[in-house]
């Protein structure tokens, strides 16, 4: 069960839950953010010690409400699930999110990307993934000591923390769970559910035609 975690922030300093920036610049970017975030939520649904969030402000330093950023998706291992207005590291056992994703849009500027890269490198992110849906391009970084190092070939890469595999073709990008199932959009999941229900209904009709009641155990 999800709960809202209590706040233990020192009085006198305000840590806003919003930074005034839009959640996404276009529908394609938003679709990918939701697909990645919800796919990871589903993947770790039985792990109470894995917290996944989208567009949540992360404050790494107590007493400093200016140093902050909001990853499109973050994953923090060793932290309980629950509702948060922001991710304040000093209230999270000193644990920084280990994995972050950014989904680019035409509005993303180089300066903003550089700022975020330096932020993630400085504050302990282990894996950093940047996907550009317009160019169908993936850039991946992995921590080596104190720095984030770019992975030369991200296609086929398996995330050490998440256990997911990234597959790039000329015109598509797929994230595959450890079971090989692709992360899907809500529409794709709904369509799959409807197809399964249709098959189940047809099977039930065949059983009834044979004089078997499928509703009886």
Predicted region positions:
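A short acidic/basic microdomain associated with nuclease active sites
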Residues: 46-58
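C-terminal interaction segment
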Residues: 2-25, 42, 58-71, 76-123, ...
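A generic secondary-structure signal marking the coil-to-beta-strand transition
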Residues: 32, 48-50, 71-72, 97
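A structured, charge-rich N-terminal accessory region that forms the first stable segment of a protein
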Residues: 25, 30-43, 51
